[in-house]
Structure formats: C-alpha cells, structure tokens
Amino acid sequence: MSDYRKIMLAVDLTEESLKVAKRANQLVQAFDAELHIVHVIEPLSLAYGGDVPMDLSTVQEQIQDQAVAHLQEFSATLNVPESRQHLIFGRPESEIQRTAEEAGADVIVVGSHGRHGLALLLGSTANGVLHGARCDVLAVRVGHDDSEAE
C-alpha cells in the first residue's frame, strides 16, 4: 500500500458519513496524513432536470447555508480546519474527483451502499468516483444492513 499524505473524505453529511469518516481517520493516523473533507451540493436544476417552473434560488441558498453549518460542525469533530473544508456545487462524481485532484489527494474515501439491480445499473456516486479518479479510492460499505456496532 502506498503512503497517503493527503486524504480526501467525500461526505453527504448524513449519519452514515460518520462511519466513512472513522475509516478516513484511521488512514490519517496510520500515515500521519492531512485530511480534507468535501461535500458536494447538487444544484436543484440538475436534480430536477432543469425544467422547474419556479425560482429556486431562495431554496438553494437555504440548502447552502445548512450545508455550510453542517460541514463546519462535521469537520470540527475531526479537527479539520476551514482551509481543508470544500463545499462545492455540481455533480458529485466529477466534483469530488476535481477537488481531490486540485488538493493533491493520494486517496479518496467515499461511502458505498452496495446497491444491486436498477440502482447498480444507474450507477452511484462511489462508482462514478472510482471509475474517474486519478488516485486510489477507498469505498466504505455503509447502510442499514450493517451489523457492526459503532
């Protein structure tokens, strides 16, 4: 295994992100690495196909304000300074890859639900990151079927 100097933790800021963060923190400790955290907000126009007959700018601002607060709170639990917190707008797969590359990350740590069937065919954020990243990707299994007590 390579030495990881910079680790990019991609989170959706749900409770499941804590398990992913725990694994990223293990890498930080093992390699004495620098931890960055990225959260991507998908613009409502992308999420709803762009044909929304109303102005969503106020809603988008509220989502951004909440995301900023949650990211700061989440980052504080891991002692990650604001300079290594990345809140980005766009498609999660491509923005996580781009942010990791810009930060010089050696590995991206992302949660994976291990979906099957239709969800697998449609793809997932973890799958998109895995196939497009120029660095290592660690997909941490998360979900309701997890029997491991944390």
Where are these regions (language model features)?
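Intrinsically disordered or low-complexity boundary/linker segments at protein termini
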Residues: M1-K19, H131-E150
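Structural beta-alpha unit
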Residues: M1-S2, A30, S75-I108, D145-E150
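Small/aliphatic-rich secondary-structure junction motif
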Residues: S2-D51
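General small-molecule cofactor/ligand-binding pocket signal
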Residues: H36-V38, R84-I88, L138
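Acidic, proline/glycine-rich short linear motifs
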Residues: H39-Q66, D146-E150
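Short, hinge-like loop/turn segments at secondary-structure boundaries
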Residues: V52-L56, E102-A103, A126-N127
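Glycine-rich, Arg-bearing micro-motifs that act as flexible, cationic patches
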Residues: V107-G128, D146-S147
